Amino acid sequence: MLRFKELYQQKIIENLQKKFSYKNKHEIPQIKKIVINMGVGEATANSKVINNAVNDLTLISGQKPVVTLARKSIATFKLRENMKIGCKVTLRKDRMYDFLERLVIVALPRVKEFRGFSYKSFDGKGNFTFGLKEQIVFPEINYDKIDTIRGMDITIVTSAKTDQESKFLLSGFNLPFYN
């Protein structure tokens, strides 16, 4: 079994119950899914770039991503409707916990000048979104084989009703916060 899943089941649930005194076990917040999005702006000029982004995201997540398409045309960006502009992957269950573990233990310590996440990254409904500027912080990515350094947006969707509950939940997984 995964370490972070065991950590949630054995310690975090108990700590959440003590702090917020829930009446029902189904009220206890949990992580529902993790969405990783990689926007590829240069795909408008070169359509082969999207394949490299898909390969990178496949290595990082362990799951094949979905290619995202433009919803409408924007002339200033030389963008037409249904053009490939990025890729995303949604992780649930065991893959979600596996990714979260690799993110916290391996990837975040490799980010340059990383002090922690701001509490302002919560959306008011218990979800947490942050961005990484480089995909090379993940050990699965070979620096010599990438064409360009790309960033990504990572959203952690929780069942928490408030940001305070979500902060306490994610702090239990050792996500570093400052403020």
Swiss-Prot record:
GO molecular function per UniProt: rRNA binding; structural constituent of ribosome; tRNA binding
Key word Calcium present: no
Pfam families linked: Ribosomal_L5, Ribosomal_L5_C
GO biological process: translation
GO cellular component, one term: ribosome
InterPro entries: Ribosomal_uL5, Ribosomal_uL5_bac-type, Ribosomal_uL5_C, Ribosomal_uL5_CS, Ribosomal_uL5_dom_sf, Ribosomal_uL5_N
Keywords: Ribonucleoprotein, Ribosomal protein, RNA-binding, rRNA-binding, tRNA-binding
Function: This is one of the proteins that bind and probably mediate the attachment of the 5S RNA into the large ribosomal subunit, where it forms part of the central protuberance. In the 70S ribosome it contacts protein S13 of the 30S subunit (bridge B1b), connecting the 2 subunits; this bridge is implicated in subunit movement. Contacts the P site tRNA; the 5S rRNA and some of its associated proteins might help stabilize positioning of ribosome-bound tRNAs.
Subunit structure: Part of the 50S ribosomal subunit; part of the 5S rRNA/L5/L18/L25 subcomplex. Contacts the 5S rRNA and the P site tRNA. Forms a bridge to the 30S subunit in the 70S ribosome.
Family, similarity comment: Belongs to the universal ribosomal protein uL5 family.
Xref: NCBIfam families: PRK00010.1
Record-given protein name: Large ribosomal subunit protein uL5
Organism: Rickettsia rickettsii (strain Sheila Smith)
